[in-house]
Amino acid sequence: MSYGPLDMYRNPGPSGPQLRDFSSIIQTCSGNIQRISQATAQIKNLMSQLGTKQDSSKLQENLQQLQHSTNQLAKETNELLKELGSLPLPLSTSEQRQQRLQKERLMNDFSAALNNFQAVQRRVSEKEKESIARARAGSRLSAEERQREEQLVSFDSHEEWNQMQSQEDEVAITEQDLELIKERETAIRQLEADILDVNQIFKDLAMMIHDQGDLIDSIEANVESSEVHVERATEQLQRAAYYQKKSRKKMCILVLVLSVIILILGLIIWLVYKTK
């Protein structure tokens, strides 16, 4: 399995600002969160090799690049969530509630992925520091320098000269080790800066969740208001139906009375003509 920098953790696309709708941002964020989780699992695997026989400068480089690219992916997702919050709400109350539920689920998933990622980041930092401490403790540079200072300028035998040359070779190797230590310290500083970036993302996420809560209250208030209007409209419809039914009943009675009157008048007229 290759643990080099992964292109899958980047989102290729045309440069320049683009207008994105709610669904496309949701889809991109969901994909990013999945990639963050996958990268976290790979970082754990690489981390388990630190301090073992598999530990090497190549492993360190791959680990650093992978965690840094994952950190950038988290920052990109954070910006997308901010963009998501700035989109205008749909007119339909049901669509507002649906979008609210989608954003709520997305932020929960993002928060969980960030928690796992940051926990691994902190553990990597601890293991790197432990590795550096062991390397410094095993360094022979200071001891070799003291031996060189105490060494006489002249040598009594060829054996002493060879011993001095051997010591200088060991010092050169130790200096190379120290250069690797410096590189690891630089990587740790970058890792700690990335951890601070994740802390800032958590703060932004907390603010978005707070704003989401205000939005939920607003939507619920609109829903309650709509329900009140619906209830009132229902009452008015029921009242109108009652009056309409009552009016129809009156019309039927009136028609019946008129029919009786016409019938009576018809009988009277018929009787009058009959008597003549």
UniProtKB/Swiss-Prot annotation:
Membrane topology value: Single-pass type IV membrane protein
GO CC annotation, single: recycling endosome
Single GO molecular function: SNAP receptor activity
Vesicular side: 270-276
Cytoplasmic side: 2-248
Domain of life assignment: Eukaryota
Gene Ontology BP term (one): vesicle docking
Modification Phosphoserine occurs at: 139, 142, 218, 225
InterPro entries in alphabetical order: SNARE (IPR010989), Syntaxin (IPR045242), Syntaxin/epimorphin_CS (IPR006012), Syntaxin_N (IPR006011), T_SNARE_dom (IPR000727)
Similarity-based family: Belongs to the syntaxin family.
Subunit annotation: Interacts with NAPA and SNAP23. Identified in a complex containing STX6, STX12, VAMP4 and VTI1A. Associates with the BLOC-1 complex. Interacts with BLOC1S6. Interacts with GRIPAP1. Forms a complex with GRIP1, GRIA2 and NSG1; controls the intracellular fate of AMPAR and the endosomal sorting of the GRIA2 subunit toward recycling and membrane targeting. Interacts with NSG1. Interacts with TPC1. Interacts (via N-terminus) with VPS13B.
Name of this chain's protein: Syntaxin-12
